[in-house]
Amino acid sequence: MEQPEDMASLSEFDSLAGSIPATKVEITVSCRNLLDKDMFSKSDPLCVMYTQGMENKQWREFGRTEVIDNTLNPDFVRKFIVDYFFEEKQNLRFDLYDVDSKSPDLSKHDFLGQAFCTLGEIVGSSGSRLEKPLTIGTFSLNSRTGKPMPAVSNGGVPGKKCGTIILSAEELSNCRDVATMQFCANKLDKKDFFGKSDPFLVFYRSNEDGTFTICHKTEVMKNTLNPVWQTFSIPVRALCNGDYDRTIKVEVYDWDRDGSHDFIGEFTTSYRELARGQSQFNIYEVINPKKKMKKKKYVNSGTVTLLSFAVESESTFLDYIKGGTQINFTVAIDFTASNGNPSQSTSLHYMSPYQLNAYALALTAVGEIIQHYDSDKMFPALGFGAKLPPDGRVSHEFPLNGNQENPSCCGIDGILEAYHSSLRTVQLYGPTNFAPVVTHVARNAAAVQDGSQYSVLLIITDGVISDMAQTKEAIVNAAKLPMSIIIVGVGQAEFDAMVELDGDDVRISSRGKLAERDIVQFVPFRDYVDRTGNHVLSMARLARDVLAEIPDQLVSYMKAQGIRPRPPPAAPAQSPPQSPAHSPPGSPVHTHI
């Protein structure tokens, strides 16, 4: 059946489709002690940055700095501005060249070395400043064909150290701005047969490709044609992605109980226009295009007026990270008998010589991203639901490395090693109790509440939770502490209880006490199993979904406690670049490569 005109389907309003765009960071590049390839002077360096596609793993050139004449210690002026996603592994590559001509073909220039890292590594380093040695690998990529070619063809020696690259990340200032505004409307069209309209506004930001993404929806004002909506706040990047002149579309609807909301009309504006505040420039005619086409005398379907507008700068996730906040990562693994005998291929704990099991895949996907925000890379790893040697005592909080005093493992590989070792020594048993591991991490989080540390607990489980009441109480208590909980459900069990713990729809409570914050994120592993066998891509999606809420959860805790970000640590003193004989240090050559 064709939808009546001026009606919108419920699905358009089910959720705020399209996440807030990532914050943008500016990467600054410096190098020290580059190889000297020029016979009678120093090298003329250029840095090329590449990003790697998540799906095809191909390196794509992102941009180039300027060429700096006659120096082995360049401080490049031209920056790289990139979108930052905490929840994604954003691989970067930096190639250095000594430019010998005006040719844009990189194979015409001497290769000086390269470095690989992730954006998270740069951001998570002390002061968001990362130093890495430049090396000449066995292969580099031909800039024209994209195919590997021997790096030695440019005169390098594979594996040789070629100086140091220094990468600094700075969040762009307009990414931290939050706009607060209020609107009212006057003489909106009457849509309800037995009463006035029930109007609400829907805001959309425009995308680069001309499409629109919903970014805010006001509350519904019942039975009025002259509504005054409540004041609301929204990150500027959500409204316009930092582009002050980008179109913002606002649609006006009449709410209907059955979800088939009636379209009243629309108008467009921009952040720059809104920032003028209350004025004649911010009174908008609400236009219904279909009515305008059909009726010659049509004027408008009412007006919407901006009553107030203010913008302030808020502390962001990256402010806290740059100020030294460490993310303490702990993993807890389900060793209950419902996983199946680890020696059999049907077991969720089966260790195939050919591929990682679901537990190891989930752990690696989350761990390899979060590890860069913990400077010592020592991660506590716990197990629950097993009988331990030598006496068969059932434990719901045992160290995978067997060390009761210090359950920390060195890196993600250390956790995997301890996990595999535990499978050979403990007996899978039960029941599935979460409360002990939640309480364990909460105890550590409670010990440091000055903003210098934030704990993230990853629980990987296969079964129906056995201690729901105790777990709810532990989570409600943990919600006032600097910690978040990620739960990944593996296997084919029903995970209804996990969805309840997630608290996206209904905030969890215990003994009549509501959790102060939503700190739990749950995903079922089976939703990410790629039938094509592309585990890399499917696990990247899993990590993205479970980690996406962590930055906001960290900031919400800090704000609730009144904790401001600390100033970034001072950068270590560098030896000043040596001035070349006939060119000031850092003077760019006017050659566009």
Swiss-Prot record:
GO MF, any single term: metal ion binding
Biased composition (Pro residues): 565-587
Primary residence: other
GO biological process: cell differentiation; positive regulation of dendrite extension
Annotated Ca(2+) 1 binding sites: 38, 44, 98, 100
Residues holding Ca(2+) 5: 192, 254, 256, 262
Binding site for Ca(2+) 2: 38, 98, 100, 110
InterPro entries per UniProt: C2_dom (IPR000008), C2_domain_sf (IPR035892), C2B_Copine (IPR037768), Copine (IPR045052), Copine_C (IPR010734), VWF_A (IPR002035), vWFA_dom_sf (IPR036465)
Keywords carried by this UniProt record: Calcium, Cell projection, Differentiation, Metal-binding, Phosphoprotein, Repeat
Region (Disordered) residue spans: 562-593
Ranges of residues in domain C2: 2-134, 161-284
Expression by tissue: Expressed in the cerebra and cerebellum of newborn brain. Expressed in the eye, lung and muscles but weakly expressed in the adult brain (at protein level).
Residues bearing PTM Phosphoserine: 19, 103, 140
Gene Ontology cellular component annotations, sorted alphabetically: neuron projection; neuronal cell body; perikaryon
Cofactor, how bound (note): Binds 3 Ca(2+) ions per C2 domain.
Function, as annotated: Probable calcium-dependent phospholipid-binding protein that may play a role in calcium-mediated intracellular processes. Plays a role in dendrite formation by melanocytes.
Name of the protein in question: Copine-5
Phylogenetic classification of the source organism: Eukaryota, Metazoa, Chordata, Craniata, Vertebrata
Gene behind the chain: Cpne5
